[in-house]
């Protein structure tokens, strides 16, 4: 364990620089630059709100913030997993010429997506305050939930990134698994509509716990 930590510390500057370089390269590939980090999730969330909140009339008075909190947390996880699964496989060519620890590539990917997530999180705060949800003492628990999700996401990305080089076909399965998880993780529905007989299975999904924790902190002051 100490050896692995020392390795990470030794390459920490490279990790930070590569994260910055990837973010900068991404902004330079489009005219709007980093604004796409904001516009893309807003468009994504708008589609779900129009379809489920307006057309299907699934909403309640607080359905908009309810949906946005769930989608914000979900998108962070989904982005890291869908992009992170191929990080080691994609860097195999580079590692043949330069010795680099495999572990740094998933870390760089997760850090890159986390920076973009933080932009969206700030916008979510602004929206919630505008909508009438005030800052309260429960916000002190938010860093703990964020850290738990970061560690949970990192663990899943490490696993996928390590397995995909040996089972390349798995990368095509990941997106379908994420789609299934999306509908089973309480992003769009309230837990009270889940039948009592299935509540145990519903809450055995750790993503449900994370998303409900965000809502408890940001919306319900719990």
Question: Where on the chain are the PLM-derived regions?
Answer:
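Hydrophobic transmembrane alpha-helices and immediately adjacent juxtamembrane helices
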Residues: 1-222
